[in-house]
């Protein structure tokens, strides 16, 4: 199966995940741990792949990431210009 990409990326939120994570002063490992503490399975490797645009982000992961990063899910997917 061939993935459709936007500018060579497989997702639209990866860059904003990285920006929000760095603004929160979290490592990829710390972000993964924060999500895992809420009962969801997302590893440091998965966060890295999301940020690099190497994987698709399922719609159910967007609110998990947004909640852990304290940002609006619509901002993560580029539908709002401000984080909150």
Describe the residue ranges of each PLM region.
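Residues that mark the N-terminal boundary/hinge immediately upstream of a DNA-recognition element
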Residues: 16, 27, 43, 58-61, ...
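Short, basic-rich loop-to-helix N-cap that marks the start of a DNA-contacting helix
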Residues: 45, 52-67, 83
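Short alpha-helical DNA-recognition segment
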Residues: 25-49
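Hydrophobic micro-packing sites on short alpha-helices
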Residues: 31, 61-69, 76-77
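A short, Lys/Arg-rich alpha-helix, primarily the initiator
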Residues: 1-24
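Residue-level detection of the helix-turn-helix DNA-binding "recognition helix"
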Residues: 22, 36-37, 52, 81
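Helix-turn-helix/winged-helix DNA-binding modules
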Residues: 12, 23, 39, 54-57, ...
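Charged, helix-prone or intrinsically disordered regulatory segments positioned adjacent to compact structured domains
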Residues: 77-84
